[in-house]
Amino acid sequence: MADHFRNIYSSRASDYHRLIAPEDADGHLARTLRRLIPPGQRILDLGTGTGRLPLLLARDAKQMVGLDLHGDMLRENAAQRSLSIAHWSLVQGDMRALPFPTAWAQVVTAGWAIGHLRGWHPDDWQTQISRVLKEMRRIAAPGGVIVILETLTTGSLTPAPPTEGLAQYYAWLESEWGFTRETLSTDYQFANVDEAVERSEFFFGAEMAEKIRANGWARLPEWTGIWSKRA
């Protein structure tokens, strides 16, 4: 599974963006982020991917920079930026060692990114994720906001961590690092069932495709957790 996601992020970024474009059909994510993040802030987005958070936040930011490890994701991000009225900068790098000075940003975000380290480094995930969290804390100015978004399952009518490993990571964020969790419905709204399968199967797999068909889901249920804290 680790190689599955790495391969997508390194070579199928445009397909990935086609998948996520119809996410958050009811706008819960956008409204929650606007509540947590005041306008006029300098924002650093880690694991920025194809631009999911910059597309939501950059227009109201004083400055926004997105960082990602994968060049293909950054190229698709730049393509999406060219279609947007907002602007943000892009940097290739590792979120465990950030090329920014201390207290550089008022807001540091990481969307659907840090959790991969739980699977990619099963034997020392706490060490690896701690490196990211310490860097987020270093970059965030005093009184700033740190926001982490992760999956709470796709294809279920109730929210829950999709794996035991992620459940451990989420609980650890709260108990050891003092983050507070909010749970949001962020369903995908596709035109029809066939489109839902066509756009999502490469990422979520054949079992999910069959579940979509069996339930007639043009609207694919999804849940997202938002963990936040003050710097």
Predicted segments with their positions:
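Class I SAM-dependent methyltransferase SAM/SAH-binding core
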Residues: 44, 50-97
